[in-house]
Regions:
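Glycine/small-residue-rich phosphate/adenosyl-binding loop
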Residues: 71
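Glycine-rich hexapeptide-repeat left-handed beta-helix
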Residues: 2-19, 47, 51-53, 57-65, ...
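Core nucleotidyl-transferase/polymerase catalytic module
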Residues: 91
Length: 204
């Protein structure tokens, strides 16, 4: 991949270029900039912005790391403070319009609902962050549910939260599976289109 080939995937000012596994599906309207590392079978939806371009004191840009089979839906914004990183664990779903601002670390199989926001936060595995919830400078233990619209800023507020139910965990898995199938379907459609174009060139 080069910046000339893909205008939506490009270098930052430090010269870092995204590392994207070929099995990942990146919508053409998404913007992937700088020191971004996208692992296998990731889905990046329309109008998402993933931008790693803020240099730390050492002059380097810390990475935004998106692990295997993560779902990034439409309009998600991922960025970080100078020298800070964002890490998203495998099979996590980040829903429409969510904002992740590093430093933050998200574990495996989490569910970050629509319009939720994170800043300087850590989510262990299987955490549910509800619609429009805001989390700042806190750590959520595994299987915690943050209700829709909650604003969580300290440890006492975290400790007051309940754990997700089995029904909620099943829902998280269903949302991830549906979007994973969507990635597969779009890739198959792209491969068919490329095959048709290739055949047309040969015939021409």
């Amino acid at each position: 991949m080069t910046s000339l080939q893909y205008k939506n995937i490009r270098h930052n000012l430090a010269g870092d270029y995204p590392h994207i596994d070929p099995t990942a599906l990146i919508d053409p309207s998404a913007q992937i900039i700088g020191n971004v590392r996208i692992d296998k079978d990731v889905f990046i939806g329309p109008l998402a912005v993933i931008r790693a371009d803020q240099r730390g004191k050492d002059g380097k840009v810390a990475p935004i790391q998106i692990d295997r089979e993560v779902i990034i839906q439409d309009g998600v914004i991922i960025h970080a403070d100078p020298g800070a990183s964002v890490i998203i664990g495998s099979k996590t779903t980040v829903a429409h319009g969510a904002i992740l601002h590093g430093p933050c670390t998200i574990g495996q199989e989490c569910f970050i609902a629509m319009r939720a926001s994170l800043y300087k936060a850590t989510l262990e595995d299987h955490v549910w962050l509800g619609i429009g919830a805001i989390a700042k400078r806190v750590t959520f233990h595994s299987f915690t549910k943050v209700p829709a619209g909650a604003v969580i800023r300290d440890r006492p507020e975290v400790l007051a939260l309940r754990l997700i139910t089995e029904k909620e965990r099943n829902y998280m898995e269903e949302v991830w599976a549906a979007n994973s199938r969507l990635r597969t379907d779009y890739l198959e459609l792209r491969e068919k289109a490329e095959s048709i174009r290739s055949a047309a060139k040969k015939d021409g």
